[in-house]
């Protein structure tokens, strides 16, 4: 199930959106995790699915370059979300990104001319 959601969900929605995105000159953002950079014990499928998303996005960016479609990955550091609380319990909020900060950087990415990039969102990294 994890691979279907994390990887195939990304692949299927990106490929299914091609004609619409091409016609509308839209962009695509996918989300990964810092786990994509290194496999972690007890997270083998999760880590590998996130690495697969990154490689897929980079490949599609190259394949679709001439169409003007831009596609990027957002890689947020540890973020304060209900799923994180469920999996890791209560943590010091000063060590976690807010979801609004991740959304702000996502919007900035959409406004950029980048394609095929992994945009790392780190705590107190951006001062715009």
Question: What is the role of each PLM region?
Answer:
Residues 1-4:
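Active-site Tyr-X3-Lys motif and surrounding loop/helix of classical short-chain dehydrogenase/reductase
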Residues 14-15, 58:
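A short, exposed helix-loop element centered on a Lys and neighboring polar residues
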Residues 16-25:
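A short helix-coil junction within the Rossmann-fold of NAD(P)-dependent oxidoreductases
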Residues 27-52, 57-66, 78:
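Catalytic loop of short-chain dehydrogenase/reductase
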Residues 29, 71-74, 84:
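Hydrophobic structural elements of the Rossmann-like NAD(P)H-binding subdomain
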Residues 73, 81, 89-128:
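C-terminal helical subdomain
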């Amino acid at each position: 199930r994890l691979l279907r959601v994390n990887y195939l969900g990304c692949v299927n929605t990106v490929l299914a959106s091609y004609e619409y995105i091409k016609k509308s000159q839209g962009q695509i953002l996918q989300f990964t995790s810092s786990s994509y950079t290194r496999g972690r014990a007890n997270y083998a499928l999760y880590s590998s699915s996130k690495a697969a998303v990154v490689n897929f996005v980079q490949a599609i960016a190259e394949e679709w370059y001439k169409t003007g479609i831009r596609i990027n990955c957002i890689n947020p550091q540890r973020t304060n979300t209900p799923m994180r609380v469920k999996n890791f319990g209560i943590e010091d909020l000063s060590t976690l990104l807010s979801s609004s900060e991740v959304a702000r950087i996502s919007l900035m990415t959409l406004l950029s001319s980048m394609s095929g990039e992994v945009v790392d969102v780190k705590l107190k990294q951006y001062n715009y």
